[in-house]
Amino acid sequence: MKNQEESGWQAFLTLCSKMQKEKFLQDLFSLFLSFGERKDVASRYHIIRALLEGELTQREIAEKYGVSIAQITRGSNALKGSDPQFKEFLQKEI
């Protein structure tokens, strides 16, 4: 089953990379992700951006975006495990 999940995820990423119009990408995510899942992705985006900016405490991030400290900790741990070049890319793009 894990192999199927990995190949499905890779196929999804490949499909995302082929989207040349933002509208198509929005339609794709609306097709594959529920409203709640899209909301979770948006929250994770805000958390990662705030952590990269480094201007707010975790408590301030939680209050500003209406997320839990646990969600922020998960985002922080994911960032800690990220490739330094990838984090540099994110800091420029986010």
Curated annotation (Swiss-Prot):
One of its GO terms (biological process) is negative regulation of DNA-templated transcription. It is found in: Cytoplasm. Residues 58-81 bind DNA. The keyword Magnesium does not apply. Its main location: cytoplasm. One of its GO terms (cellular component) is cytoplasm. It holds the Pfam family Trp_repressor. Coiled coil: none annotated. The keyword Lipid biosynthesis does not apply. Gene3D superfamilies: TrpR-like. InterPro entries: Trp_repress, Trp_repress_bac, Trp_repressor/repl_initiator, TrpR-like_sf. One of its GO terms (molecular function) is sequence-specific DNA binding. HAMAP family: Trp_repressor. Belongs to the TrpR family. This protein is an aporepressor. When complexed with L-tryptophan it binds the operator region of the trp operon and prevents the initiation of transcription. This is Trp operon repressor homolog. It comes from Chlamydia trachomatis serovar L2 (strain ATCC VR-902B / DSM 19102 / 434/Bu).
